[in-house]
Design a protein with these regions (language model features):
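Acidic, metal-coordinating catalytic segment for phosphate/diphosphate chemistry
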Residues: 124-130, 136-178
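Short amphipathic alpha-helices in soluble, non-transmembrane regions
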Residues: 66-74
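Hydrophobic N-terminal alpha-helices or hydrophobic patches in metabolic proteins across all domains
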Residues: 38, 123-124
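Conserved catalytic core of two-metal-ion nucleotidyltransferases
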Residues: 77-117
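Active-site nucleotide-donor binding segment shared across nucleotidyl transfer reactions
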Residues: 24-67
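Helical scaffold of the NTase/Pol beta-like nucleotidyltransferase catalytic core
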Residues: 1-38
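Conserved small/polar residues in nucleotide/adenosyl-binding loops
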Residues: 186-188
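Short, charged/polar surface micro-motifs in flexible loops or helix N-caps
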Residues: 60-64, 106-107, 118-121
Length: 188
């Protein structure tokens, strides 16, 4: 296992520890919701950006239940901050939560939780996308994506899907190519 794969595996293990130690999945289940892991942790492509993404489904979605879950999460002394957004009256039809959790090494992990009605337009969509990405990865494309993520400056905010499209769809292999690829999207 090379250096990048080792680092990615360690961070993915830490992310799983955050999920377990925070009790986040059981907290959401306690209010009748179904938490589903999405994003880079689900694809196995979590690198240095400490971010854990969940889509959470309820039928019906009740704002009070969402707040009850977050109140329970906030009781954990490792939770440092929580943000909330109500997007129920938008196309996204969701409640958006962001929590920051300090792990055993006092490293902050951002936990993004999108709470939406079961059966909504996005129900299962991002889970299927993540599973398709994971299914088409080769050793080479996995290593390329991890390297690009590793080489990205911490100040640069790039969505994971950008790396995946660049590498898997468009054949990008280096960070210089990735930067050019991103610039080309602006000029389309």
């Amino acid at each position: 296992m090379d250096k990048l794969s080792t680092l990615a595996a360690a961070n993915q293990q830490r992310a799983q520890e955050v999920i377990r130690d925070s009790g986040i999945e059981s907290i959401w289940r306690s209010v009748g919701a179904e938490p589903h892991l999405v994003g880079s942790l689900r694809t196995g492509l979590l690198m240095t950006h400490r971010d854990i993404d969940f889509h959470i489904y309820s039928s019906p979605l009740r704002v009070a239940d969402s707040f009850a879950a977050m109140a329970r999460l906030a009781e954990n002394s490792r939770i440092r901050r929580i943000e909330y957004g109500n997007l129920l009256d938008t196309n996204e039809e969701c409640l958006e939560w962001h929590a920051w959790y300090a792990d055993a090494d006092d490293q902050l992990w951002q936990i993004d939780m999108i709470h939406m009605p079961k059966g909504s337009a996005y129900d299962g969509y991002f889970e299927r996308v993540a599973d398709r990405i994971a299914a088409v990865l080769t050793d080479q494309t996995r290593e390329t994506i991890l390297r690009l993520k590793y080489e990205t400056p911490e100040t640069e905010k790039i969505m994971g899907i950008e790396y995946y499209q660049a590498v898997l769809r468009d054949g990008v292999r280096t960070y210089a190519e990735f930067e050019a690829w991103r610039l080309s999207l602006i000029h389309i």
